[in-house]
Curated annotation (Swiss-Prot):
Keyword flag Signal: yes
Secretion signal span: 1-21
Superkingdom classification of source: Bacteria
Subcellular location: Periplasm
Provenance organism: Escherichia coli (strain K12)
InterPro entries: T4SS_TrbC, T4SS_TrbC_subgr
Biological role: Essential for F plasmid conjugative transfer, participates in F-pilus assembly.
GO CC entries: periplasmic space
Protein's recorded name: Periplasmic protein TrbC
Entries under Pfam families matching the protein: TrbC_Ftype
Alphabetical keyword list: Conjugation, Periplasm, Plasmid, Signal
Length: 212
């Protein structure tokens, strides 16, 4: 299996994502780390590092992925490209973790998919790509991983230290609803009193834009 430079950048982002796994994510050290990863990804796209690419290919060969796992990685690469093309100005994100009991996590992923809201994880399971892919695929219905993303920077951006948490964002700012509520109930709270109430109304009506 050969890695494109875009795939390599995504793989490095995921491998390093576990550094953000502590609860105290919004620290100078973590912000500096994220900036370094952003610079590294840009450098890899502009000037390929063949030695680093060879190392990553060796990791993939020694830890082969199943077809479903490859699809999971492809989805992550696609989402990374989309986020680089331009972030949406409004939408919602639902922050979860594998520390949530499986039954509850399955329900949450089903609800976020229903509303078109990305379920956002901080990092990988045991810092391992294959284990993470298998864990996600065991939770989602019909292998549909399109509603799941891994992005530790979003946890830092919105100051998310406990999960689950819903973030609805818009040009006026963002609203955060914390706690184990149904996704629909959390959206209703934002729709009632939030700064981004119109976005929440649209999501409840099935015509909102999901965040990336």
């Amino acid at each position: 299996m050969k890695l494109s430079m875009k795939s390599l950048a995504a793989l490095l982002m995921m491998l390093n994502g576990a550094v953000m796994a502590s609860e105290n994510v919004n620290t100078p050290e973590n912000r500096q780390f994220l900036k370094q990863q952003e610079n590294l990804s840009r450098q890899l796209r502009e000037k390929p590092d063949h030695q680093l690419k060879a190392w990553a290919e060796k990791q993939v060969l020694e830890n082969p992925l199943q077809r479903s796992d490859n699809h999971f990685l492809d989805e992550l690469v696609r989402k990374q490209q989309a986020s680089q093309d331009g972030k949406p100005r409004q939408g919602a994100l639902y922050f979860v973790s594998f520390s949530i009991p499986e039954e509850g996590l399955k329900r949450m992923l089903g609800e976020t998919r229903h509303f078109g809201i990305p379920a956002t994880l901080r990092g990988m399971v045991n810092n391992d790509l294959k284990t993470t892919a298998e864990a996600v695929l065991s939770l989602v219905k019909d292998g549909a991983t399109d509603g799941v993303q891994i992005d530790p920077t979003l946890f830092s951006q919105y100051g998310i230290r406990t999960v689950p948490a819903l973030v609805v964002f818009c040009s006026q700012g963002y609203d955060i609803i914390r706690g184990n509520l149904r996704v629909g109930q959390a959206l209703e709270k934002v729709a009632a009193t939030g700064d981004c109430r119109q976005v929440a109304h649209d999501l409840l009506a099935g015509k909102g834009d999901s965040g990336k």
